[in-house]
């Protein structure tokens, strides 16, 4: 039988010093415990000594190579499976965006938003199941324009004030719950960790080429935008008092242009199916216009619309942190810190779109079993449908505040205690009088036969008969939305350690967490102008500016297709909105509502405790083990104010408005608890070689939109009915049983090779279910008395314009029928409301339940090699992830498949000497499933493989001054999403490279 040996190792020194409660600040300081706000440095070459003024003794190293060496030391000396990125120097992180840095780590992939990293996926597990900590504290998140979730948006944090990023991939009892893929700890500066004066200031000019390729009505700001950052840290009173202050302000102008089938593809249909939206069956009129018809058992879908949007963005990001530390004795250190960030985004958009009404058509198809149209044409004659052109102008502001206090007490040589408390908030809200989102729609009613060619990367829209002189643009609809999201976390954590022997340690802790999330919104929708209630003569031609479409997609295959409908008109949103408000005489309807009609609130109160026992063993080879368990209980309360729907009204050819009445509150609750065991072991196979094993259980809580009670109906419906959603606060967290294995060879000071294998067995995934319901008993005119009269008079059921004209011309003034003026093509406009004896409208309601399980496995390969003293170095990694739960494109209906799972690879080359440093980084992510629902229902969305090349070149003028050039996305890559077939385009985005030139002064 073996017993622990009283042997002091580098690991045990690091574990002991972890309880000294000092967060490392800079490039050479690497922390080891994500659950504690104060952590220490297992990578440091010199161990902590009790006589250190702040409990830490460090050696300052800087530069690219030093950053890689420190990251390697973190990986080598950590308990469990840990990777990280360490700052090159005070105030200098390898990437300008933290998510972009994280993607250099094996197993980590990122989602991009407005041209930069936003959210992370780790080992095939999506952003909502990766926990982000700031100095060991759980952080709230708020994002407008997305479903309320738990995914942290790294775009809110500037990298200049960050010391290191730690990615904990294996489970430990002391780690807070929520990170199934990983727990990511963002470490900022602490003054007592680095005694003396430390200061730096930097300026940067940013030129984003994407901001140039925009229409004049969308462009914002100048070609070059400024950034400034600074960091000051100092200690006094013999190292007992310290202050650190960091701040940054950054502006950025950018753009991105998108071609999309924004409302998804209708279907899927079987080749032999005959329904609204299907292609003509053999032997029926129109069947002769179909080439390579889908076989009877093939699946196919047809596009619902085609849209081109040009988006201009301005962003101002402000970050700041103040840290005060006081150590009244060598045994006690207190820390008070305040962190603030603000991210302001202004958006302008102009778009061109065409809707399909599933009338007579012609089409050419790919082969099955999942067929897609190469060309889809809807025959429209005469040319009097709408060519839609819209605009938007809105702004949002996100603010994050965190106030925290930490006290670390070394009771004696064996016992250390720590108390950490913080209150943090994240709040997103409108920052414009026009709301957080809006659309002002215009149209020319001169659209004839309309086609889309999907054979190239860019879907190519063609329109016959367009005549902007005969049918000038006119306002035909508007939507103004005010949305608000606030997340708040109040957390108290206690940590302790008892060094029982020199080679054994017991860790323990308690925590309470109170998390609140609020999501509220209101929609002001102008329905009675969608069909053109106002007339074109109300809007002078001078308000509209002619543009050429193809120039804004010049980097996408297909932009030079001569059939592309190239002419569209833009406008000044504010001016046209003001004119439309005057023309209609109802200006209040062209502004967002002042209050919220939907207000959903969720509160989670959690309590936890843990025990963890760490031991060094002296077998034939040194072994370190850690055994622990964590218990956690959570209570969930969801209160929702939702509007009560009161009517279902036909307001234009293919759109129905859901009328909303007085909102009402409902409250639902849920509760759960978990025991989460963990075990880590590593063995020194040789002095330069390690083997690792880990088993642990982790949980990840459901997104807030899945938990929130209250049934919410979308305000726009279609002929076939509407849509809605409803949460379930009784959802259990996803639980994962995790196994990790690794072999690591550190064959010199700066180089290593590692191979890892991981498995995750997940249960309680929230499956999405859709049921057809008839909420509130809303009546629809479809199939009612007026509708049937039009059918009886000879209108085809698919010819909705014929049906509307008949109803308006024969039943105007009757109950529910309000006729407006005819449009320029002689078609009647107005609204037709459902009547008491009409059919009840069907709604497809989406909800959630614990019903799914999944398994995934993967391999990680890492190599880092420095070529002696030449200054050259190489870093490469590849991650392979696999699961049996892929999406079956040939299957109809709801499916459960793991989203976000993909292979990924990184290749980084560096060169560094006393004067120059060069870094070229290529990141690649394979195709992955992003969602199992699109705008039309249960259909997949695939993000195609994407690779990006970034470059930085730095020059040290002297020991104080350095300059740097950076290039992002140098090869000008595009992003593309598709559906069941690669030709079934959903989204194609063109942005552009970004260039930066900076100077930095270090005091």
Report the location of each language-model feature:
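Short acidic/polar hinge/loop motifs at secondary-structure boundaries
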Residues: 139-169, 220-223
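Extracytoplasmic beta-strand/coil segments of soluble accessory domains associated
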Residues: 99-141, 169
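A beta-strand signature from Gram-negative outer-membrane beta-barrel systems
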Residues: 155-202, 256, 877
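N-terminal periplasmic "start-of-domain" segments of outer-membrane beta-barrel proteins
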Residues: 58-93, 119, 127, 137, ...
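Outer-membrane beta-barrel transmembrane strands
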Residues: 188, 205-206, 221-235, 248-250, ...
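C-terminal beta-signal and terminal closure region of outer-membrane beta-barrel proteins
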Residues: 2-4, 776, 780-783, 788-791, ...
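C-terminal beta-signal and adjacent terminal beta-strands/loops
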Residues: 761-764, 923-933, 954-1003
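Gram-negative outer-membrane beta-barrel transporters
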Residues: 761, 766-773, 777-933, 971, ...
């Amino acid at each position: 039988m073996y017993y622990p040996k009283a042997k002091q190792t580098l690991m045990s020194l690091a574990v002991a010093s972890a309880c000294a409660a000092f967060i490392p600040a800079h490039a050479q300081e690497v922390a080891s415990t994500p659950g504690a706000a104060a952590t220490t440095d297992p990578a440091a070459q010199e161990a902590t000594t009790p006589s250190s003024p702040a409990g830490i003794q460090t050696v300052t190293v800087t530069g690219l190579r030093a950053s890689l060496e420190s990251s390697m030391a973190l990986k080598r000396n950590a308990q469990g499976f840990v990777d990280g990125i360490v700052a090159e120097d005070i105030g200098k992180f390898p990437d300008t965006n933290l998510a972009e840095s994280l993607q250099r780590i094996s197993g980590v992939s990122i989602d991009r938003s407005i041209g930069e990293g936003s959210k992370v996926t780790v080992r095939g597990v999506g952003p909502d199941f990766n926990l982000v900590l700031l100095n060991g504290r759980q952080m709230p998140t708020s994002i407008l324009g997305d479903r309320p979730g738990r995914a942290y948006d790294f775009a809110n944090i500037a990298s200049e004030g960050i010391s290191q990023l730690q990615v904990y991939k294996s489970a430990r009892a002391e780690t807070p719950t929520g990170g199934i893929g990983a727990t990511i700890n963002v470490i900022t500066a602490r003054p007592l960790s680095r005694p003396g004066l430390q200061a730096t200031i930097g300026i940067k000019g940013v030129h984003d080429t994407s901001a140039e390729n925009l229409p004049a009505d969308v462009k914002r700001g100048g070609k070059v935008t400024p950034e400034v950052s600074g960091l000051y840290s100092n200690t006094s009173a013999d190292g007992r008092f310290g202050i650190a202050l960091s701040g940054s302000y950054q502006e950025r102008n950018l753009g991105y242009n998108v071609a999309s089938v924004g409302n998804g593809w209708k279907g899927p249909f079987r080749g032999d199916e005959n329904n609204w939206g299907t292609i003509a069956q053999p032997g029926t009129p129109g069947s002769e216009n179909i080439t390579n018809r889908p076989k009877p058992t093939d699946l196919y879908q047809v596009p619902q619309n085609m849209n081109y949007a040009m988006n201009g963005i301005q962003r101002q990001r402000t970050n700041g942190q103040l840290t005060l530390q006081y150590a009244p004795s060598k045994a006690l250190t207190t820390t008070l810190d305040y962190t603030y960030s603000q991210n302001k985004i202004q958006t302008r958009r102009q778009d061109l779109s065409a809707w399909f009404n599933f009338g007579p058509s012609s089409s050419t198809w790919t082969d099955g079993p999942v067929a897609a149209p190469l060309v889809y044409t809807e025959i429209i004659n005469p040319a009097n449908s709408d060519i839609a052109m819209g605009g938007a102008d809105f702004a949002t502001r996100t603010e994050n505040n965190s106030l925290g206090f930490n006290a670390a007490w070394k009771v004696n040589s064996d016992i250390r205690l720590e108390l950490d408390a913080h209150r943090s908030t994240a709040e997103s809200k409108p920052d414009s009088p026009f709301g957080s989102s809006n659309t002002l729609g215009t149209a020319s009613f001169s659209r004839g036969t309309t086609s889309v060619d999907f054979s190239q990367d860019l879907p190519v829209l063609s329109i016959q008969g367009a005549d902007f002189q005969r049918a000038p643009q006119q306002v035909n609809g508007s939507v103004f939305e005010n949305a608000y999201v606030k997340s708040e976390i109040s957390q108290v954590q206690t940590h302790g350690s008892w060094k029982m022997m020199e080679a054994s340690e017991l860790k323990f802790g308690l925590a309470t967490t109170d998390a609140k999330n609020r999501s509220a919104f209101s929609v002001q929708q102008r329905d009675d102008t969608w069909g053109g209630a106002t007339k074109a003569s109300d809007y002078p031609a001078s308000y509209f500016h002619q543009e050429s479409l193809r120039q804004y997609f010049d980097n996408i295959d297909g932009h030079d297709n001569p059939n592309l409908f190239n002419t569209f008109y833009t406008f000044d949103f504010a001016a046209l909105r003001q004119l439309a408000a005057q023309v209609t005489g109802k200006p209040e309807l062209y502004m967002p509502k002042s209050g919220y009609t939907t207000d959903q609130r969720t509160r989670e109160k959690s309590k936890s405790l843990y025990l963890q026992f760490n031991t060094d063993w002296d077998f034939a080879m040194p072994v370190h083990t850690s055994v622990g368990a964590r218990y956690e209980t959570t209570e969930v309360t969801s209160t929702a104010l939702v509007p009560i729907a009161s009517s279902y009204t036909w307001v234009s050819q293919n759109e129905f408005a859901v009328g909303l009445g007085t909102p009402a509150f409902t409250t639902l609750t849920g509760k759960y608890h978990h025991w989460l065991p963990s075990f880590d072991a590593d063995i020194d196979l040789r002095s330069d070689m390690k083997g690792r094993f880990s088993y642990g259980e982790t949980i990840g809580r459901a997104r807030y939109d899945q938990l929130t009670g209250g049934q919410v109906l979308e305000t726009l419906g279609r002929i076939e009915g509407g849509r809605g959603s409803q949460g379930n606060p009784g959802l259990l967290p996803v639980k994962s049983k995790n196994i990790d294995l690794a072999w690591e060879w550190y064959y010199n000071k700066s180089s290593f090779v590692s191979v890892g294998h991981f498995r995750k067995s997940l249960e309680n995934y929230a499956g999405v279910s859709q049921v057809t319901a008839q909420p509130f008993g809303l009546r629809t005119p479809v199939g009612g008395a007026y509708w049937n009269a039009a059918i009886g008079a000879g209108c085809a059921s698919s010819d909705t314009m014929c049906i509307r004209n008949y109803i308006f011309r024969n039943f105007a003034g009757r109950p529910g029928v309000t006729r407006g003026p005819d449009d320029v093509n002689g078609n009647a406009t107005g609204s037709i409301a459902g009547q008491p004896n009409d059919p009840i409208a069907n709604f497809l309601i989406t909800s959630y339940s614990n019903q799914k399980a999944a398994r995934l496995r993967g391999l990680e390969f890492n190599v880092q090699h420095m070529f002696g003293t030449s200054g050259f170095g190489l870093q490469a990694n590849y991650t392979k992830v696999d699961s049996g739960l892929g999406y079956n494109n040939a299957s109809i209906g709801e499916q459960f498949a793991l989203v976000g799972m993909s292979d990924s690879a990184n290749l980084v080359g560096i060169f560094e000497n006393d004067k120059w440093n060069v870094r070229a980084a290529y990141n690649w992510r394979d195709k992955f499933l992003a969602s199992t629902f699109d705008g039309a229902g249960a259909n997949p969305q695939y993000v195609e493989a994407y690779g990006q090349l970034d470059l930085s070149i730095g020059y040290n003028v002297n020991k104080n001054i350095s300059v740097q050039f950076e290039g992002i996305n140098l090869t000008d890559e595009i992003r593309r999403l598709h559906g069941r077939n690669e030709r079934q385009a959903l989204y194609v985005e063109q942005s552009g490279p970004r260039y930066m030139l900076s100077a930095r002064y270090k005091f």
